[in-house]
């Protein structure tokens, strides 16, 4: 479930974020549902959800899947990239057989309902969309081959730090890509990462976004995008799209948000400077036309909190005497 009390919702508003795609971890090849939310601080869990957004599902490839249980002394399949590929092939074949059985049964209802296979069937019928944790070119190619065989497109490859090696193939497949700006060498499968990755994928013609994967970095995505101006020389407008309209397109909500246009949701940020500057601060963050973060009011609340804290401490100190 979503936690509407998570302080990171407010902190990300303070960094100029209006929407966020919430995903679970990457221990399983085929994971669970994801959730697109708007950062409506103070709302309950249901009201955080982005109304009308398409359903997505988290997939994962590579080291995280391979090592998720073996490090705990409980090895399990899959324990290799080939095993991960086989998990995918087996799952979608079962889903294909399941759909065929449902069609054959017609209205008789003789096929036992399977929620896992229902989700995979939604993917093949373009009713649910994949966000896939990925790094290495071999596994990216393998994932696309599974999609081609079973008639679906991987909507988004996330992290995708070897994306520059297979950008042309991902474009032909129809995928979007969401990557880090300059992360490198934090595990073995990232050793070939380069800071020009986003630039190269953009030039090939992919729809590129910058992702955070971290609550702290999520409120600094403006600075992460700015790095791509240095690494590749894209224009400021091109890199700004990587944290605005491009991710909105990936999530199929670009008709509602991601740019300033008559008829779209009033999701806006007032910056103190060029938002790509390291000196820029979000002065006001507006979601659906409502101001959810105001820097002046935030400063005033902090003063009140400090004064109240001092009063309570003084009272406790006096009581001890």
Protein language model features and the residues they cover:
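Soluble non-cytosolic domains of exported or imported proteins
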Residues: 2-6, 78-82, 137, 192, ...
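Short acidic loop-to-helix transition motifs that present clustered carboxylates
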Residues: 137-139, 160-165, 245-248
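Polyanionic/metal-chelating signatures
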Residues: 5-154, 281, 287, 316-320
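Short, charged, surface-exposed secondary-structure boundary motifs
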Residues: 32, 47-49, 165-168, 186-194, ...
């Amino acid at each position: 479930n979503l936690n509407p009390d998570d302080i990171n919702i407010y902190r990300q508003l303070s960094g100029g974020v209006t929407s966020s795609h919430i995903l679970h971890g990457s221990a399983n090849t085929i994971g669970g549902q994801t959730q697109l939310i708007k950062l409506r601080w103070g709302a309950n869990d249901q009201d955080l959800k982005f109304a009308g957004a398409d359903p997505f599902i988290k997939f994962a490839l590579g080291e995280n899947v391979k090592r998720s249980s073996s490090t705990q002394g409980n090895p399990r399949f899959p324990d290799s990239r080939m095993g991960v590929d086989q998990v995918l092939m087996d799952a979608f074949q079962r889903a294909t057989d399941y759909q065929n059985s449902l069609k054959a049964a017609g209205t008789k209802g003789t096929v036992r309902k399977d929620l896992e296979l229902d989700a995979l069937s939604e993917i093949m019928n373009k009713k649910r969309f994949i966000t896939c944790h990925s790094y290495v070119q071999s596994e990216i190619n393998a994932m696309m081959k599974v999609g081609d065989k079973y008639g679906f497109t991987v909507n988004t490859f996330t992290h995708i730090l070897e994306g520059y090696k297979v950008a042309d193939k991902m474009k032909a497949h129809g995928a979007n890509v969401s990557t880090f700006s300059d992360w490198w060498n934090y595990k073995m499968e990232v050793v070939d990462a380069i800071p020009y990755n986003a630039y190269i994928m953009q030039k090939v013609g992919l729809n590129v976004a910058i992702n955070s994967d971290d609550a702290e970095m999520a409120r600094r995505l403006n600075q992460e995008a700015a790095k791509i101006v240095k690494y590749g020389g894209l224009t400021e407008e091109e890199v700004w799209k990587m944290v605005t309209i491009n991710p909105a397109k990936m999530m199929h909500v670009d008709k509602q948000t991601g740019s300033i246009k008559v008829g779209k949701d009033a999701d806006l940020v007032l910056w103190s400077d060029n938002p790509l500057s390291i000196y820029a601060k979000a002065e006001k963050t507006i979601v659906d036309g409502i101001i959810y973060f105001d820097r002046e009011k935030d400063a005033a609340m902090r003063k009140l909190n400090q004064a109240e804290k001092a009063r309570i401490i003084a009272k406790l100190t006096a009581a001890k005497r």
